[in-house]
Amino acid sequence: MGQKVHPIGFRLGITQKHRSYWCTTPQKSALWIQDASFLRNFIKKKYIGAGITHIEIQRQDVDSPSLGIQIYAARLRQIAGNDSKGLERLQEELVKQLQIFYRKRNLVEPGTIHLRLSVKPLRAPEAYAEVLAEKLVEELEQRKPFRRAMRQTVQRALRAGVKGIKVQISGRLNGADIARSEDVREGPVPLQTLRADIDYSSKPAKTIFGLLGIKIWVFRGERLTRISNVR
């Protein structure tokens, strides 16, 4: 059977950036991976409707517990609030939750945690698969017909200027006894082309008939169209 690789992981270092920036000893690698995963999950669960596409975590010093978090989101006000102290409150809450995370797992606390937090807006939010998937999940959970929801998702993406998109829904569609998959595709989606700027997201939708699996691939154009430094 054919094996499918993750579209973003397939292009790391080519057209996709890494989401974590740090280098440490093998003893600390496992700990830093755990707390980075915890912070990402906590932020995404707390701000479900904010349209968070990805979160970058940076660490500069091996011996220091300081870290920087950069959130890329479609709706900044939902995260930062109306005043300038919204980010400060979130920053304090993240430090507190991280300390609780260490205590619950009997991990060695690194000392005073210095956390820098920033939020960056997205130029065209509906050109990102994560934002489109969140909206599609919301519509399906509100019992909108899945074919109409898929078509509207494609239309929103095309209006945002994407070159191509594929939307797939799997599960008991319309309450059918046998699960199946249906997809809608518009434009090219070259998954095997490394220079293609492909964005991908997969999410579950909890409906009255059970879970539906949602996958969205977005093709935003090609990068690395020429190589000028090779002779």
Swiss-Prot record:
Where this protein primarily resides, as one coarse class? plastid
**Which Pfam family is an annotated match for this chain, by its short name?**
Ribosomal_S3_C
GO molecular function list: rRNA binding; structural constituent of ribosome
Q: Which domain of life is it from?
A: Eukaryota
Q: Where is the KH type-2 domain?
A: 39-123
**Cellular component terms per the entry's GO annotation:** chloroplast; cytosolic small ribosomal subunit
Q: What keywords are assigned to this protein?
A: Chloroplast, Plastid, Ribonucleoprotein, Ribosomal protein, RNA-binding, rRNA-binding
One GO BP annotation here? Answer: translation
What does the record note on quaternary structure? Part of the 30S ribosomal subunit.
The UniProt family comment states: Belongs to the universal ribosomal protein uS3 family.
Q: What is this protein called?
A: Small ribosomal subunit protein uS3c
Protein species of origin: Chlorella vulgaris
Q: What is the lineage of its organism?
A: Eukaryota, Viridiplantae, Chlorophyta, core chlorophytes, Trebouxiophyceae
